[in-house]
Structure formats: C-alpha cells, structure tokens
Amino acid sequence: MGSIEMKILIKGAGDLATGIASRLYGAGHQIMMTDIAVPLTVRRLVAFSRAVYEGEAVVEDMTARLAKNQEEAEEIMEQGDIPVIVDPKAECIQWFQPDVIVDAILAKRNLGTKITDAPFVIGVGPGFIAGEDCNCVVETKRGHTLGNVIWDGSAIPNTGVPGNVGGYSIERLIKASADGVIEPKAVIGDLVRKGQIVAITGGEPVYALMDGIVRGMLQPGVQVTKGLKIGDIDARAKQEHCRTISDKARAIGGGVLDAVCSYEKSRGKYALILLAAGQSVRFGSDKLKAVVEGEAMYESAISRFEAFQGFKSYVVTGKEEITLSAESAGCTVVCNKEPEKGISLSVKLGLTKAIEDADENGTPLRGVLFSVCDQPRLKKSTIQRIINTAFHNPGKIVCAGEGTRNGNPVLWDKRFFDKLLELDGDIGGKKILKENVDSLKIVPVQAGELQDIDRKEDLGTA
C-alpha cells in the first residue's frame, strides 16, 4: 500500500520550521503553519514567517501565503501551496484536525503543546520530553546527533552558545545594543567587516564582530530588546547560503520526516488493549482504584492510551467506573462480566473485538499490544518504543524488560493470535512466551516500570 497524504500542522514558521516544511511538503503531505503577529525570524529570506508581513513567501520551490481564516487556508492548500496563519495558540487545531503536529517554535521550552493535541506529536529541540509532552523529540543541536529522533527523553539542553559555523560561534551573532526599533544598516547578502555598523537599535549602533556575509537580519521597524539576536554573519561568505535552506534545517527536517514516516507506516496497524477486569484477590480490595501519586491506577493506565490516537484502543472491564473513564478517553469498552474465569477470558474478548473491528475497517492488524492497570510507573514512551520495535521486527513478540526480567506491556504479532485465542483459565500469555523464546524482542526499561501492584504493601514502593 502506498503512503497516504497526511494533514500536518507546523507550529512556527521560522527558517528551521521552513526546513521541516520542505521535507514534509516534498513527501506529499498537506502542510499548514502558524506564527505570531510579528515574527522575529533572522534568516527571513528562507522562512515562511515572512508571509505574515509580506503576504507571500517563496522559498526554493515552495510558496507560502498568509491566510486570515479557515476558508483562505483551505483554498491555499487546495492550490498546492502552504498557508501561514497568525495563531499563537494554534486554535486552528480545532478545525484543521491534523494527523500530526510539529512544534517547531524553538522557544527552548514547551509553550503549551500536549501529547494529546493530535494522533502524533513531535517536539523540536529542548523543552520537550518524549512520552510526556509529545511522542518524540528531534535534536536541534549542531554536531553528531543533529536531527536524531528521540523516543524517550529530551534533546540536549540549550547552552546559549551557538554552534560552530566556519570556525566561528558567538561572533556570528548580531545582537541588539539597546531596547527600541531596529534600523538595519546592512541587508542580507552584504559583505561586512569586523567593526562595521550593521544596524541601529534604540538609537545605538550595532557592530559586526567578524568578517563575512550577512546571512540574516530582522525586518526594519521591529521592536527589539537589548541582547536579542537580530541577525547573523557567515564566514563562508557564499551568496547562495543566504537564499537556500541551511544544512541544519535540512537535517532537522530529515529527522522530523523520519518520525512522520514511522508513524505513517504503523498507524492503524496495531491495537492497544488494557486488561482491567481482575478481581484483585491478593490485594484484598479493588486495587485498580488504588491511588498512586494522586490518581487511581486505572485512570493513569487509560490516560497512557490517550497518547496513541493513531491506534484503536480497547479496555476490557466489567466495572462501571472504569467503563465511564475509558469511554470519555475515546477507548472502546469490551465488557467482561465473568472475571472469575481468569485473565484468558479478558485476553480473548479484547483480541476478538480488535480483530473484528480491523477486518470491518479493511485494515487487518499486524499486532496487538496488551497492557495492565497495575503498573503505575509505566511510561508512554515505553509503549511507543514497543510499537516501533514491533513494526521493524514483523513476526516477533515484543515486551518490556530489564536485565533478566520481562514484563508488560507485550505486543503480539498476528501470527500468535490463534494461540492467544486458545488460552484458558487464569493463564495469560506467559505460556506462549516460554514456548517462543526465539521470537522474543526486549525493549529495555527502568526496573520501576515493570513493578506491578499485587498487594497493598506494594503501594509503599510504587
């Protein structure tokens, strides 16, 4: 099956965001971008943010145009171009309903993006945690890891020191010397010498700190603050670098495209099933309602699934509270009124429903992930990594593990569906795992993630 065009919202329209747009647009996806009313993009000749104050911006073979509303944005996309809309809070999410959101604002902190904002969410640069704020993070720091996709954790923290280009780092920057309005004295593409006045800010001169070509400069008339980056100088002094997407932007765009392709190829091909019908015999009461860090265990388990809107999610339970919580989170509830028959019944009920739904939708499942409610330390990023591993290892069983200990979640390839449907009594998939050790792939996790709550005393270590 060929790739299907997805709707992708890029928050931010600066030069790096434009590099990301270039990769995604070239791959055939439908792109829309947001920005603030007065963009502060230094490399504005290669940034779609320029469309905000010029109405249109052409970068290489792409054209972006300012859209004032939904109707204009849709018309621009229909014509094959990229709409840029002034929408700092990205309220357009409500009507655009993107498949993917890329936060490329590059504020060095998260300004409000949530992992539940779209089926797949990517954070660009520091300030995001994969599995908490977004599904993955793309590294933006120059060097060996530039453009890497991070599925667990964060990008390298901002140091405040720009990367080395042509042997220069701090010297490359042109910074405002005072608060006030900027009046450029050099334009993008000009060759300048160290000590030359390149701008006036707040009536104070700004001097070049090195020889080279002005690669970026803010537009005239913008209000700036002292110390703000208003331009940059490139020692390589090549005119074409001023009007083409940078190597850094392309590398970051490549990382985003890798992540998007990974999601695109796996979405809808796996189902997630939460087993929540147990009797909690050893616990002495309903352990799924036990509170860990201010939240009932069943609630935190359901909330993990909310981060994976690209996959159909099921909750097998016979409990009213859990049913209501699951339905409000968009999960399909599969009723199990006979939990005394053991975990095998929940496995079979959930798997049967998932297979039926997939067949009805014409998208046969490649695998199913089973999770449980009593692992309060399980991270969303672990579920994501298990799905990724399963996609790249067809025919395998993939589970979380630490050292010699393996545990939930477990993702079963479709070739094991028949064996799972043959389970009986209070026997889960461990028997099948033992018989198919050669087919097992382990996703390493921290030991705390594997801890399950069986007895009340376990709560003290959770």
Kindly label every feature range from the protein language model.
Residues 340-419:
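Conserved beta-loop-beta/alpha segment of the NTase-like Rossmann-fold superfamily
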Residues 330-341:
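Conserved donor nucleotide-binding strand/loop of the catalytic core
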Residues 4, 39, 268-320:
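N-terminal glycine-rich phosphate-binding loop and ensuing alpha1 helix
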Residues 8, 270-272, 368:
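Conserved hydrophobic helix-helix packing surfaces used for dimerization/oligomerization
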Residues 2-267:
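Well-ordered secondary-structure scaffolds
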Residues 268, 272, 418, 422-462:
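Conserved alpha/beta core of the MobA/IspD/sugar-nucleotide pyrophosphorylase nucleotidyltransferase superfamily
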Residues 321-328:
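Acidic helix N-cap motif at the loop->helix transition within catalytic regions
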